[in-house]
Amino acid sequence: MPTHLVWFRRDLRLQDNLALAAACRDASARVLALYISTPAQWQAHDMAPRQAAFISAQLNALQAALAEKGIPLLFHEVADFNASIETVKNVCRQHDVSHLFYNYQYEFNERQRDAAVEKTLPSVICEGFDDSVILAPGAVMTGNHEMYKVFTPFKNAWLKRLKEDIPPCVPAPKIRVSGALSTPLTPVSLNYPQQAFDAALFPVEEYAVIAQLRQFCAQGADGYESQRDFPAVEGTSRLSASLATGGLSPRQCLHRLLAEQPQALDGGPGGVWLNELIWREFYRHLMTWYPALCKHQPFIRWTKRVAWQENPHYFQAWQKGETGYPIVDAAMRQLNATGWMHNRLRMITASFLVKDLLIDWRLGERYFMSQLIDGDLAANNGGWQWAASTGTDAAPYFRIFNPTTQGERFDRDGEFIRQWLPALRDIPGKAIHEPWRWAEKAGVVLDYPRPIVEHKQARIATLSAYEAARKGA
């Protein structure tokens, strides 16, 4: 009887799991599951404590769900990816594994690890799957067989390719012949700092995640275009955490969206949310083609020469939400308190750090990863390089958000700001966007800082720094 081992990583679900489905295809095979915790590696990659707590909860739910199918989950903890190579080898030897199944990860360290694992297992058949994307990297290329560097042509080619053959979702495995496991389960515990997360916003059980997806596609996807930019409105899906850890697949998102919004592929209702899924694909494909992105190198080479300011005081003020710009500060306090930030606010806060404070985007990228429950290297790096004008198809370097007008535009009445900045709750109407002006006129002393920089002057300094770097190319 063959023994099939499924190595779980960022794919913590039963439904539409390509590696798990392939491992269970042979009804006569004994199927085992494996998860390896690597705390030192996670620390090096700045994994957020809230994401660790989320993964821990998902693992325990996964363990119970697998047990109902008759599949035991083996849990091991080692320091890092290098140590995990030997662990996989030992598990395969101990359980006489004939086949190893896993879903690809596209980051540089992860790809090196997987290649090393396959090399150490010459007698084991290893099968990998492009599970975390809808279309595999390399499926969408230019006429010169190169990766697209601009999103819109990539999107058009991606849609054309998708319409030719939409990848199906695969069902969860059936109960193995041996039946459900009867032995008591030992709770999985991760040796990594953890912070509590809101399980109502970020559900753990698969059925709850799928219910969240169904509700959004039926009730929210149609209005996503008009509501997605306003942080005081519940206009986004909140599915990013489940996508980041693999509690949900992008194929599940696509199929549910098309079931509810069948015109989405042609730009109809739901099409803007589909765009977000395609952006996710774009950044993953880019990371596979350009591994330097995994090492936090800018895509546009001349931007390496930007003379960043080293100002710990400014950086700390940004981290804590004490910059004196309400929309920036409210956003950062939301991030610090919940592990999540609205996407429009991610753009605003990133732009402020880089183009108002002239601080290296990589410091912001790293801080976001250390806080985000939905931390994902490809998406986070892509977003920061877009905001910093260092990435492919990024905002031009001279596009600099005015944080005050961004607040006035996307939180006009200050509803979101008041939620996160209690010191400003009593400021009337739109005056909340420039509280220092209101305070001066009203003769009130606010428990809130004045702006740490003046935007117009900061903009001039940033343009000068970028132009000097570009001319040195």
Predicted ranges, named:
Residues 234-423:
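Active-site-proximal binding-pocket segments
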Residues 7, 49-50, 104, 225-226, ...:
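Short, contiguous strand/loop micro-motifs
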Residues 145-300, 410-411, 415-473:
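Glycine/tryptophan-enriched, flexible segments
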Residues 1-166, 269, 464-469, 473:
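Trp/Phe/Arg-rich N-terminal binding region typifying the photolyase-homology
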Residues 46, 315, 446-449:
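Short coil/turn segments at secondary-structure junctions
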Residues 21, 90, 329, 347, ...:
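A broad detector of short, well-ordered amphipathic alpha-helices
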